[in-house]
Design a protein with these regions (language model features):
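Short, low-complexity intrinsically disordered segments
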Residues: 46, 58-59, 133, 157, ...
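Ordered hydrophobic segments in well-structured contexts
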Residues: 30-34, 124-135, 149-153, 160-166
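Alpha-helix initiation/capping motif
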Residues: 41, 93-95, 188
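Glycine-rich portal/gate segments that line the openings of hydrophobic small-molecule binding cavities
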Residues: 66-143
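Hydrophobic ligand-binding cavity/cleft-lining segments
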Residues: 2-83
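Surface-exposed flexible segments
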Residues: 52, 97-104, 178, 182-186
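Histidine (H) residue identity feature
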Residues: 30, 38, 62, 66, ...
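Terminal "cap-and-tail" regions of soluble proteins that handle hydrophobic small molecules
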Residues: 1-26, 139-228
Length: 228
């Protein structure tokens, strides 16, 4: 994928890379994962991030890979602007300490593409942000974490919602003079399949309890459909 065309992620037509990984010419590692979230909606998905999962809930999300969860620079009522401070593994690999700084969609997508996707029901949730490769990840003059980019885009369907997850690891490194060879050494090829498997597993696992949890926490505003 041309990394300057993020708007294409909001188009439900099949992408060249829906599930897999590739090394871009500048060395950035692109991982794509598609996950079917049965009985879930984009509203539920966005709420999960806005609720800022605790360590206990974070472990529910992925019982083998997730270790700890904390939140920094919290903004009430939204995940945007907050930083998720986590420790996790990718498919059982050595644990990593990471920062995820959630951002507004219009920082990465054009306003027209967002509006078109919403009007045409091509998207029901957009979760996006910047990733840091350590808890001491550097920031630029605007306070933005320097490192990677991540996108989770939901589209509601008759059976639930489909999730597109795309990661661009090392996104900021070329701009500070790192060569493609440098990026290969810093972010090895083995990271791609490990992150792909991790992503598919964590969101499949999330889909199995998110509907009940969402309704339990929002029963004053959403109907509860009893199974009997």
């Amino acid at each position: 994928m041309d990394m300057n065309k993020f708007d294409r992620l909001l188009d439900p037509a099949p992408l060249t890379l829906e599930m897999g990984y590739e090394r871009l010419e500048n060395g950035v590692l692109h991982i794509a994962c598609r996950t079917d979230l049965h009985a879930c909606t984009g509203e539920m998905f966005e709420w999960w991030f806005r609720s800022r999962p605790s360590t206990q809930q974070y472990i529910w999300w992925h019982p083998t890979d997730h270790i700890s969860s904390d939140w920094l620079e919290v903004h009430d009522g939204t995940h945007i602007g907050s930083i998720h401070k986590v420790e996790e593994r990718f498919s059982g690999s050595e644990s990593k300490q990471l920062l995820i700084q959630f951002a507004k969609p219009d920082e990465f997508f054009s306003e027209s593409a967002i509006a078109n996707a919403i009007v045409n029901q091509h998207t029901s949730a957009i979760i996006c942000g910047r990733g840091g490769e350590s808890w001491q990840a550097p920031r630029n003059s605007l306070g933005q974490i320097m490192g990677s980019r991540l996108f989770h885009i939901c589209r509601d369907t008759d059976w639930g919602c489909v999730l597109r997850s795309h990661f661009f690891l090392g996104w900021d490194l070329p701009s500070i003079g790192k060569s493609p060879h440098d990026l290969r050494n810093m972010i090895g090829d083995q990271v791609a399949p490990a992150l792909l498997g991790h992503c598919y597993n964590e969101f499949t696992l999330l889909s199995r309890f998110l509907p009940s949890l969402f309704i339990a926490e929002n029963r004053e505003t959403h109907p509860v459909h009893l199974p009997w």
